[in-house]
Amino acid sequence: MNIADGRQAFSAPAKLNLDLRITGRREDGYHNIESIFCLIDLQDTVYLKPRDDGKIILHNPVDGMPQEVDLSYRAASLLQKYARNPAGVEIWLDKKIPTGAGLGGGSSDAATVLLVLNRWWQCGLTQRQLIDSGAALGADVPFFIFGKNAFARGIGDRLDEMDIPKQWYVIVKPPVHVSTAKIFTHESLTRNSASSIMPTFQNLQPFRNDMQAVVFKEYPEVWKAYSELSRYGFALMTGSGACVFTACQDRNSAYNIYRQVSDLYEAYLAEGLSKHPLLSV
């Protein structure tokens, strides 16, 4: 969508980890995972405006952080060396995805910047090259570049498309920020879940999140939100938290739960997507 001042609007959807297992720790300190990633229609909007002077300007960094450490800025900076001509861009972020929630908001914004600027700047990078570049920005970035629901392995950069039934999700965000680094370095974290061959959505059930027990121990507010949501059905934490969610087969069922929990918590009602909106552009 074009805006009067020359900006163009692009979607950056959130994700849920419907299953997350840690299968080992690598020599470089990162962890190998296996996870089901699902796109949802809760999304940020990234506004981009091209410049021809080589400058990258992020107009509204998240939480007042310096623009140089923002993932969207870093994504644009990363691509500049591949641009055919001196290229710049102005970036605005309309945030709807809560930060520090396990929903991948910052990573999704960065992936959208990479996908759009790869075209605008005629960088010519393949999807695989974008995925490899995006992995340097964050573990969730490759999935958003892949753009389809997926079973992920490695550090999240080995992706196979997965067929996930259409579902609605109720997402609850407790009033706490979870430190991903703290959870990944916790002595009690499970790091040896059995690795599987490429599964189907059905044969991975019951779903689990290997980080959930540690987060519940260190952040009681997440446990409380999980306990509340579990009253209505099977609940699970996404990513390293803090959000927890439950799935429903139809919107009415999900909305009824949403009405109840939104009186107690910041809550979201979201529909699952089969592919990234930019794949249709």
Curated annotation (Swiss-Prot):
Catalytic activity: 4-CDP-2-C-methyl-D-erythritol + ATP = 4-CDP-2-C-methyl-D-erythritol 2-phosphate + ADP + H(+)
GO biological process: isopentenyl diphosphate biosynthetic process, methylerythritol 4-phosphate pathway; terpenoid biosynthetic process
Keyword entries, A-Z: ATP-binding, Isoprene biosynthesis, Kinase, Nucleotide-binding, Transferase
Pathway where this protein functions: Isoprenoid biosynthesis; isopentenyl diphosphate biosynthesis via DXP pathway; isopentenyl diphosphate from 1-deoxy-D-xylulose 5-phosphate: step 3/6
Active-site residue numbers: 15, 140
Residues annotated to bind ATP: 98-108
Molecular-function GO terms, alphabetical: 4-(cytidine 5'-diphospho)-2-C-methyl-D-erythritol kinase activity; ATP binding
Enzyme Commission no: 2.7.1.148
InterPro entries (alphabetical): GHMP_kinase_C_dom, GHMP_kinase_C_sf, GHMP_kinase_N_dom, IspE, Ribosomal_Su5_D2-typ_SF, Ribsml_uS5_D2-typ_fold_subgr
Protein's job: Catalyzes the phosphorylation of the position 2 hydroxy group of 4-diphosphocytidyl-2C-methyl-D-erythritol.
Family statement drawn from the similarity comment of this UniProt entry: Belongs to the GHMP kinase family. IspE subfamily.
Protein name according to UniProt: 4-diphosphocytidyl-2-C-methyl-D-erythritol kinase
Protein's gene: ispE
